[in-house]
């Protein structure tokens, strides 16, 4: 497996792998510095959309991944999401992905957030998966933390295999195939 470069990412985006796509790095908006997004040397920095689901314990339910209670979240739409101390929120990428059959995509958090105690987690994007990426933001601090919509939040790394997989995510009817918006756990 080899990591793919900015040139490869731009070509793949022209074929529809990432929409919308930013071919360079964006670091300012309206004259103000932002958390960067767009194509980097060996990755693509995704943006957080303005839809969030913020975890709450007001309903005192048990978190069960097999029978997840949607009442565990409060829906929020806005430019800035404030995550309560030691809590988390779900969001999604602005970008919609269509991963090629020979590619596995790994997501890593941005250091700007990590250095503030905000951790981004995303499981790998498997071959032939497509959809908006659901982002998990954990606020590991004892203070409220901000996440900015429309700005960079995580970096995707594209690894291409020297052999195409026998069975892709699409082939096996993956439960998150084609997801749009913030998607809760499914079994």
From Swiss-Prot:
The active site is at 136 (proton donor/acceptor). Pathway: Pyrimidine metabolism; dUMP biosynthesis; dUMP from dCTP (dUTP route): step 1/2. Catalyzes the deamination of dCTP to dUTP. InterPro entries: dCTP_deaminase, dUTPase-like_sf, dUTPase_trimeric. One of its GO terms (biological process) is nucleobase-containing small molecule interconversion. It holds the Pfam family DCD. Its EC number is 3.5.4.13. It catalyses: dCTP + H2O + H(+) = dUTP + NH4(+). Homotrimer. Keywords: Hydrolase, Nucleotide metabolism, Nucleotide-binding. It is an enzyme of class 3 (hydrolase). This is dCTP deaminase. HAMAP family: dCTP_deaminase. NCBIfam families: dCTP_deam. DCTP binds at residues 110-115, 134-136, 155, 169, 179. GO terms for molecular function: dCTP deaminase activity; nucleotide binding. Belongs to the dCTP deaminase family. SUPFAM superfamilies: dUTPase-like.
């Amino acid at each position: 497996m080899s990591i793919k470069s900015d040139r490869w990412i731009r070509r793949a985006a022209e074929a529809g792998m990432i929409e919308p796509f930013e071919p360079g790095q964006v670091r300012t908006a309206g004259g103000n510095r932002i958390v960067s997004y767009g194509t980097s040397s060996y990755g693509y920095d995704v943006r957080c959309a303005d839809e969030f689901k913020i975890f709450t314990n007001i309903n005192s339910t048990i978190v069960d991944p097999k029978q997840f209670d949607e009442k565990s979240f409060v829906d929020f739409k806005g430019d800035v999401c404030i995550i309560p101390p030691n809590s988390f929120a779900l969001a999604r990428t602005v970008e919609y992905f269509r991963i090629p059959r020979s590619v596995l995509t790994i997501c890593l958090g941005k250091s700007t957030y990590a250095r503030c105690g905000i951790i981004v987690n995303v499981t790998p994007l498997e071959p032939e998966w497509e959809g908006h990426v659901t982002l998990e933001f954990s606020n590991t601090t004892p203070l409220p933390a901000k996440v900015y919509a429309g700005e960079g939040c995580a970096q995707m790394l594209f690894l291409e295999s020297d052999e195409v997989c026998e069975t892709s995510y699409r082939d096996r009817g993956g439960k998150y195939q084609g997801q749009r918006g913030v998607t809760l756990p499914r079994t």
